[in-house]
């Protein structure tokens, strides 16, 4: 059974009454499976990696926002120049939490979002302000920290609402991420995507690489392998069926690619999660 590192708020918050703090990781090294007694919002500001989160596995890259709750188990792996801005908070210490909770996903709502580059730039400025104020213990700084945090939550939420209302307002790069997520089990043709959105293939490839430090093919492969790993640990489907569901018609090739990423065969990976 995998050991889980337990992280306490005592190690991160400046005082027992402090409601919020900021922990920036530039760069984030691989970090073992852990849980903590506080909530966390993680904003990926650069690079990429794989996020192991409870029973699911996802690739993460620039623009991802993760809402981690107290007690969640998670870790980072396969990191490549990964920069994280972590906002740690304790709901029971937030006087504005009755308002804030309306802007935080809960229960079965999606807890992993994407924001565009414009929003990411705006957030960087707010997080820098929050980092300064959250390290102070006077009452005015604690109140200001809550106000800045609320502004951050609203900005992220508003961005999602605007993008949901008008697909045309989503940046072309975000449209590409959406298309890739819908292509895990089938072929993805970049030329067709670019023709549909009136884009130059070379330009899309260049911008994607600048934003994620990965090629489009590398990102799609990570998506497929993460989906496969999630299915292996949560279902009894055969390796061959999972390979097909994740876009690999040849199960032997799938096993080879899987082994290069997870350092074991699909069957060996599954065996780690079988209850004895």
Curated annotation (Swiss-Prot):
Residues 174-272 form the HTH araC/xylS-type domain. Residues 191-212, 239-262 bind DNA. Keywords: Activator, Cytoplasm, DNA-binding, Repeat, Rhamnose metabolism, Transcription, Transcription regulation. Its main location: cytoplasm. GO terms for biological process: positive regulation of DNA-templated transcription; rhamnose metabolic process. GO terms for cellular component: cytoplasm. It comes from the Bacteria. Pfam families: AraC_binding (PF02311), HTH_18 (PF12833). It is found in: Cytoplasm. GO terms for molecular function: DNA-binding transcription factor activity; sequence-specific DNA binding. Binds DNA as a dimer. Activates expression of the rhaSR operon in response to L-rhamnose. HAMAP family: HTH_type_RhaR (MF_01533). This is HTH-type transcriptional activator RhaR. The gene is rhaR.
């Amino acid at each position: 059974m995998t050991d889980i590192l337990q992280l306490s708020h005592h190690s991160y918050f400046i005082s027992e009454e402090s409601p919020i703090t900021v922990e920036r990781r530039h760069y984030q090294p691989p970090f073992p499976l852990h849980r903590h007694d506080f909530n966390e919002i993680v904003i990926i500001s650069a690079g990429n990696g794989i996020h192991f989160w409870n029973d699911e596995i996802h690739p993460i890259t620039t623009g991802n926002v993760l809402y981690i709750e107290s007690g969640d188990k998670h870790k980072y792996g396969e990191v490549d120049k990964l920069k994280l801005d972590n906002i740690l908070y304790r709901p029971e210490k937030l006087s504005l939490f009755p308002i804030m909770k309306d802007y935080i996903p809960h229960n079965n709502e999606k807890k992993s979002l994407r924001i565009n580059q414009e929003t990411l730039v705006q957030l960087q400025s707010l997080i820098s302000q929050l980092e300064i104020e959250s390290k102070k213990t006077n009452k005015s700084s604690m109140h200001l920290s809550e106000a800045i945090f609320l502004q951050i939550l609203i900005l992220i939420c508003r961005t999602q609402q605007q993008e949901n209302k008008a697909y045309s307002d989503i940046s072309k790069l975000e449209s590409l991420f959406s298309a890739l997520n819908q292509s895990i089990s089938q072929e993805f043709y970049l030329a067709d995507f670019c023709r549909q959105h009136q884009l130059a293939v070379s330009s899309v490839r260049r911008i994607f690489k600048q934003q994620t430090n990965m090629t489009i093919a590398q990102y799609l492969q990570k998506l497929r392998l993460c989906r496969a790993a999630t299915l292996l640990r949560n279902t009894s489907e055969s390796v061959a069926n999972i390979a097909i569901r994740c876009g690999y018609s040849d199960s032997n090739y799938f096993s080879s690619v899987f082994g290069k990423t997870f350092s074991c065969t699909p069957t060996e990976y599954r065996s780690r999660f079988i209850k004895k």
